[in-house]
């Protein structure tokens, strides 16, 4: 029996579908449901001098992310307790959230295309967390 289900979303069109899958599990277990989005840390991508205000860009992205998470939660068929966002290493951010919020099931999506088979973030996440995972196939059309 799960007590807290965390669904990792990328804020793409499939995010609502993935959230509804997680909502179904949470509903059946009478569990808490939360969502999380992890942004890449843009400052880590640049090694040279660039005339870009990274702090301003990160703030704007963070605000847009939070608004998207709120909208996603409002459209959920099940109440969403926490709307989390983080930046940095996907596996580490998820592991930290799982520990901090006492999550016992992580729900993620997985694209079944050529590139995802080569470079799946799901594999990395599986190596970093110690709770059950539900990996939902997301088919590209």
UniProtKB/Swiss-Prot annotation:
Instruction: Give the principal location in a single coarse category.
Output: cytoplasm
Q: Does the keyword Cytoplasm apply?
A: yes
The listed locations are: Cytoplasm
Per its UniProt record, what InterPro entries does this chain match? Rossmann-like_a/b/a_fold, Universal_stress_UspA, UspA
Q: What is the annotated role of this protein in its UniProt record?
A: Required for resistance to DNA-damaging agents.
Its source organism is: Pasteurella multocida (strain Pm70)
In terms of NCBIfam families, this protein maps to:
PRK15118.1 (NF011698)
Q: Which family does it belong to?
A: Belongs to the universal stress protein A family.
Its keywords, alphabetically, are: Cytoplasm
Q: How does it assemble?
A: Homodimer.
Answer yes or no on keyword Cytoplasm: yes
Name the domain of life this protein comes from. Answer: Bacteria
- Recorded protein name is Universal stress protein A homolog
**One Pfam family of this protein, by short name?**
Usp
Question: What would be one Gene Ontology cellular-component term for the protein?
Answer: cytoplasm
